[in-house]
UniProtKB/Swiss-Prot annotation:
Broad class of the protein's primary localization: nucleus
InterPro entries: Homeodomain-like_sf, Myb_CC_LHEQLE, Myb_dom, Myb_dom_plants, PHR1-like, SANT/Myb
Organism: Oryza sativa subsp. japonica
Protein name from the UniProt record: Protein PHOSPHATE STARVATION RESPONSE 1
Compartment(s) of residence: Nucleus
Amino acid sequence: MSSSLPILPKSLKDIPRSHNTQNILMPGQLPNDSMPLHQSATQSSISHPRASVVRSSYSAMLGYAANPIDSVSSHEGHFMAAPFISQSSNAEMLQYLCNNNTHGGHTVPTFFPAPACGAPDYMDTITVPDNHTQSGSSTVTSDAAKQNEWWADIMNDDWKDILDATATDSQSKSMAQPSNSAASQPAFNQSTSSHSGDICPVTSPPPNNSNASASKQRMRWTPELHESFVHAVNKLGGSEKATPKGVLKLMKVDGLTIYHVKSHLQKYRTARYKPDLSEGKTQEGKTTDELSLDLKASMDLTEALRLQMEVQKRLHEQLEIQRKLQLRIEEQGKYLQKMFEKQCKSSTQSVQDPSSGDTATPSEPSNSVDKDSEAALDPNRIGDNHPKNSTNVGANLKTAATESPDSPVIATDGSELPQEKRRRVHES
């Protein structure tokens, strides 16, 4: 590539240059860097050897020493900050403006116009004291023609190579700057960029989610659409089981999206279950009242059941007592029956034993005979004892006749009476 930069216009060539004008730094520096002139020049000479030749020739023509350290030592009292330039890969010309007729302060803007797209323009100014400005304005030499020739010598292929080599570094640094750096540029940078003729495309920010949602098409739900929607929901098993995707597949309506179906399904659910919720509240109130009544009734029932259980328990105790008494009565009856049977047996035994009665009857008459004999022997007692003895004899005869009717009757004198007499005795 053997293209060279265009030469400055004639109006710029006629501008006088003073010997006290500051050196111009090479591109590739950041705008906020406050590095002195000799440091930037040393760095640029290290990175680009050809640039050092250009800078030394330019310094010689302006009256400075070739050594950057000497230049700084001789002029470090005349300025506060070093100038900076802004460059781009497609720079078309080099512009240098100098105003030496100011009093009280002198600013020299140095920059490269025509920035690339997305790379901001940076520029810094040089503040020069009054005495230096006056001395620079008074010294106008006849080296203007040589300076014009110097500009022609600089604009060659070497200068283009230097710009191309540093273009990539400046672009990478400029892309890291925030987007609002373009708004903070001075007005004269904007004017120079307009003269360069470059057009930078302005990228608009991405649309927000609100704009995207606003761009969605709204849909009016007609009664026919709602009926088909309800039919699809019922097919899927109700509003709780239905999904927007399934409803959309069943409806098959052009222009209907899943967002429309989703919103309508939510509205359908809320509208359907809202009255049910109010009814549920009233039902809950009724159920609470019913529960309270049920609790009271259940308490009454439990109390009644408890009383009934107590009564049944008492009845059971009474039945147990009655059963025990009945057992005792049965035992006593059995005991009495045994006693009665024993009495009957004893009576039958006494009746069935006649020998005991026969032995007793003859002894009694003998005793009575003895008594009669004694009475007969005692005359004093005859009158008194005679009726008694007679009665006793009669009684004895009767008992003997009853006990043994077949037995012979014995007379008072001890002789047996005949049967006829026995009958008479019995009849009497």
